[in-house]
């Protein structure tokens, strides 16, 4: 046991150390070399709203220009002369009453950063600074979308190579349902899918090596998503790979009982969760040591708001916000045109009931696949638990947190597929068997007649 813990700790330290080293190295790129493309990007954000709709009033088409302006602002305030310190003590210019878009303009024109944002690692800077040498933010978004789609295709090809046709189709359906093409709308939407789809490739490629390997990969996943993501749909980084492994093992006849499945899944999720939290703790500790300031206070205060804060702009009490956090994410999944569009929720749930409920009714057999069904339903329910726990964050930012429901969609597809045995299929099979028996009987009778003539 102690050797395993040592191995997991070593993996955690190695991965985080690698990422931090890359962050420092890319921070050495002089700001003068990226200023031109940053100024082009700033021109775009100068005329953009903090949160803009790209298609009518549909919430899933919201561009989070607010977060992007802050990220570019932080990127600019990382000093190549002090890469270690400024990669930890991340700050931005808030722009005062004119907002963060104006703050980015001020930062590029010499104003010092005045707002601390050291609670995140801002790991995407590793890619953004080099890319800003060749293109502006719009080009980076297109490159990011291309990378996400390429990783998705690689996952589908790997599943097809393994003859996991249903799993490949369910992944494709889930990505379409969460509007995968819309991740191009904001820089902050990209990392969660880049990390999650990369981890899917690793989990699928190495899952036969055993559960210990999956736990090790879970550590890698926890570090990666904490380092690169902005708390968008972080649960995808562990739930998506795990549900794919569950379905692949079931189709190969290697999946255990429900209690057995829960045991190794809980271990993987715990490894992921511990490494996720520890990645943040290392950042706050390192930033506190480097600056001599207590970075824990603001970070923990911010975390508390996401757990139990309430929306001041909508004056929503906590008891109402908790269920509304779930409603908002379901609403956005179904194309809601407001934070909570009950009309779209009702229509969407009816469609889900017709498709999945009807599919299950028509295709299910007498023998229920209880172990795999319970397992995938547990995984599919986790995103809603996240929405309830981080209710303030999930309610206010449902336009990107809703994408975590991709796992739920795969789970629903799996419930129908894994329990299939339709009367129609069985009828055809029985008919074929009867026809085959009849033909065999005719052949035997014919042979007997011929034998009799002899």
Spell out what each predicted region is.
Residues 126-144:
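Juxtamembrane segments of multi-pass membrane glycosylation machinery
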Residues 357-381:
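Membrane-interface helix-loop-helix junctions at transmembrane boundaries of multi-pass membrane enzymes
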Residues 215-242, 264-277:
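Membrane-interface alpha helices of multi-pass inner-membrane proteins
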Residues 178-181, 226, 380-400:
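Transmembrane-helix signature of polytopic, lipid-linked glycan biosynthesis machinery
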Residues 26, 262-353:
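Membrane-lumen/periplasm interface segments of specific transmembrane helices
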Residues 396-418:
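Hydrophobic/aromatic-rich transmembrane helices and adjacent perimembrane loops
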Residues 126, 172-194, 222-227:
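Aromatic- and kink-enriched transmembrane "portal" helix at the membrane-lumen/periplasm boundary
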Residues 145-169:
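Transmembrane-helix motifs of polytopic, lipid-linked glycan transferases
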